Structure formats: structure tokens, C-alpha cells
Amino acid sequence: MRTASSSSSMMKFSLLDKKPKNYAQPEVLCHTFDTLSNLHKLLPNHLMETLYSYRSEEDKKKCENPELSGLERILARHELPKEINLTPKPNRMPLWKRKIINNVTDGWKKCHLLTRNTKEPPMSTIVVRWLKKNMQPTEDLKSVICRLSAFGPIQSVTVCGRQSAIVAFKDMTSACNAVSAFQSRTPGTMFQCSWQQRFMSKDKIYSKKCTQKTQPKECKQETEKTANNS
């Protein structure tokens, strides 16, 4: 008899030996929520029962498809309670295919061939502007080309308007000399040269270094005159 009573007492107090769960740990908390969600699925859902009651045989056959293609027809045919919330159709495109398409679009955005295909002007390209006034000698495209050819060989000339043109020199030093000589409009000619590339206008040190040794004498005299007048 003593053995039976002792065994029953051990069975009663066997749960006291277990340690309490520490819900501060994320693993224990996730496991608890998983068990609760599984138990919640086992509970009876009256809304789904009413939904299933409205289905016909055709709808049942169509609802066998995991995409639930026949539910829209059920909603259009019967006036169901507003409390029933139906999830929208899942996208038929698989996840791996969607990732491939996203990677392709990202690669197209980062494609370096697009910048290579667009023809950018060379570094030695400048923009020339001049004004025509009655009291001062008139300037035209021929006279502008003759002036700029004194700095070095010209590769191409593109007319932008009546009083402006884009000139591309063959070398960088010639372009630096032209820009440094005609940075501002002189009162005698109203003639101005500037860089077509925006970042080149900020790099004044490079243009000064190039023009100190390779600037023609005529340009030096014109720059000195402008400096004295200012």
C-alpha cells in the first residue's frame, strides 16, 4: 500500500519539477504564438460556414483551385454579410520569376552602356558668344574662327545661334588658353568664351597652369589690357 500511495504522490507533484518558461526569450515567445495560432485554426468559424453554404456545385469545383477564382462570382450572386473579409487573388507570377525581373530592371538602371552610347562632347569643347553693336566692330563666325585658331587647331565648329557657337579644339591647352583669354566680355569686342562642361568652369587652377606657359603673345596683351581696365 505504501508503494501505491508514494507513486500517486509522485505523479501528482511531477509538474513542479519543470522550470517556468522565460517569455523574454524570442524563441519561447515565437513557439507560444505558433501553438496559439494552431489552436485558433481549430476553432469553429461561423462566417466561413455561411460562405460555404452559399456555394453551388460549380463554385465548389472552381474553389478547388488554390487561387479561389470562383469567390468573386459568389459575392456578385449573393448578398453576404459585410463581416466576411476575403483575401485578394494571389499573383500568378512565382517569386523566383519576379526576382529575376527585378534584377533585370535594376541592372538596366545601372547599365554603363547607356552613357557610352550618348555622345558627350570632348573636354576641350568651349562655347563662344559675341555681340553685334553699331559703334563697335561687328563679329561673325569667320572672324570668330580666325581668332580662336590662333590658340591651336580646331576640331569642329557647331553654330548654336546667330551670336554663339560650340568650338572643339584638338588639344586641351588650346581650349584653356581661349577660355582664360576671353573669360569676360571685353569692352572692345564683346567676345566671351566659356567651358561647355560645367565641372570645367570650377577647375580654375588647371586652366591657369596650362595658360602660363603656352599662351600666345596676342592673348597675353589682351588679358593684360582687360586687367588694367578693371
From Swiss-Prot:
Alphabetical list of Pfam families matching this protein: DUF4523
One of the record's GO molecular function terms: nucleic acid binding
InterPro entries registered for this protein in UniProt: Nucleotide-bd_a/b_plait_sf, RBD_domain_sf, Tex56
Transmembrane segments: none
Cited PANTHER family: CHROMOSOME 6 C6ORF201 HOMOLOG, TESTIS EXPRESSED PROTEIN 56
Protein name in the entry: Testis expressed protein 56
Native organism taxonomy: Eukaryota, Metazoa, Chordata, Craniata, Vertebrata
Gene: TEX56
